[in-house]
Amino acid sequence: MSQTQLYRKRIIPEECVLLKGDTILYRDSDIIVTKWTSIKPKKDLHHGFSCYFLKDGYKISKFYYEDGRLLYWYCDIISYTYNSETDTFVFTDLLADVIIFPDGRIRVVDLDEVADALESGAIKKEQVEDALRKLNKLLTIIYHGEFDSIKKNLEQFEQ
């Protein structure tokens, strides 16, 4: 079997990028855990770890500064396709995101992008419905103080 390939597909801006720098640390039928360095260098974001929750439809990432300090947790709402012949995943970013800061503050971001994409036809109504349901499920977990159980899936693979 070939090596697993992961792609990130964005709706805004429209692009599909092979995550060639990502290292898969763990994979089963429920989750994929990766470590990576930033594709496009940014002032603060240097590297991180991500956990794709395949059945739940979100990717939880832990973003770090270059010196190893936690920047924040970043939660993408996603969908995906899988090609078993090529062992390839294409993860589509459904635009709505949640940021959890080290001090506990929570921000839901990019909902305007969801509206813009729906208005322009870049995203389908069904995708928006799917994204909102997944976002609601994730926020319910966060607001009920259960985010630690999600973080454990990722943190056990950090080295």
Predicted feature locations:
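Phosphate/ribose-recognition catalytic cores of enzymes acting on nucleotide-derived substrates
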Residues: 46-83, 91-96
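Compact, glycine/acidic-enriched structural inserts
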Residues: 1, 100, 115, 121-133
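Conserved, surface-exposed functional patches that form binding/active-site neighborhoods
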Residues: 74-121
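Short acidic-glycine loop/turn motifs at beta-strand connectors
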Residues: 27-29, 66-68, 101-103
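Charge-rich, low-complexity N-terminal segments
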Residues: 1-48
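Charged phosphate-binding loop/patch that engages nucleotide di/tri-phosphates or the phosphate backbone
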Residues: 131-159
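Short C-terminal domain-edge/linker segments immediately following a structured domain
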Residues: 55, 64-68, 105-109, 127-132, ...
